[in-house]
UniProtKB/Swiss-Prot annotation:
Natural source organism: Macaca mulatta
Main location: secreted
Segment forming the signal sequence: 1-24
Its biological purpose: Participates in at least several B-cell activation processes as well as of other cell types. It is a costimulator of DNA-synthesis. It induces the expression of class II MHC molecules on resting B-cells. It enhances both secretion and cell surface expression of IgE and IgG1. It also regulates the expression of the low affinity Fc receptor for IgE (CD23) on both lymphocytes and monocytes. Positively regulates IL31RA expression in macrophages. Stimulates autophagy in dendritic cells by interfering with mTORC1 signaling and through the induction of RUFY4.
Family from the record: Belongs to the IL-4/IL-13 family.
Name under which the protein is recorded: Interleukin-4
GO function term, MF aspect, one: interleukin-4 receptor binding
Gene: IL4
Matches recorded under Pfam families: IL4
Positions bearing carbohydrate: 62, 129
Superkingdom, taxonomy of origin: Eukaryota
Cystine crosslinks: 27-151, 48-89, 70-123
Amino acid sequence: MGLTSQLLPPLFFLLACAGNFAHGHNCHIALREIIETLNSLTEQKTLCTKLTITDILAASKNTTEKETFCRAATVLRQFYSHHEKDTRCLGATAQQFHRHKQLIRFLKRLDRNLWGLAGLNSCPVKEANQSTLEDFLERLKTIMREKYSKCSS
C-alpha cells in the first residue's frame, strides 16, 4: 500500500509544522527533562558518583553553549561506557547494584538530551581538570537552571 502523490505534499507540510512547533517548545521541554534527570542523579549517592570525570565545564570559557552541551554529553558517554560494568561501581549488595543500573540509565538519558540541545555531530574533548561525577553534575545542573530561567523569560 503506497502513498498517493496527492497525500505527499500535505504530509510534508504537517511534518514541517510539527518540527517548527516542537523546536519552539524544545527549550522548555528538553531543559525541564534535563533538570529533572540531574535532580535525580544528584540525589543518588552511589559508589560511582565519587569517581572522576573530565571536567569540561571548568574550561568552557571560550566555547559556545552548543559546544559545552556537546562536550558534556561526550564526557558523560565516556564515563558511563567505561563504568557500566565496573566492579567498583556495581557494589556488593543487590541495592547497590540496582542504584548503579539506575545511575547508568539516568546518565544515558542525560546524554541523549544534551546531544539534542547541542545539535552537533561530534566535538573534541581535550583532557582537562578532573572532578567527581557528583560535582560535575551539580555544576551542570546550575548551568541548566540558568538557561531555563532565561528561556522562561
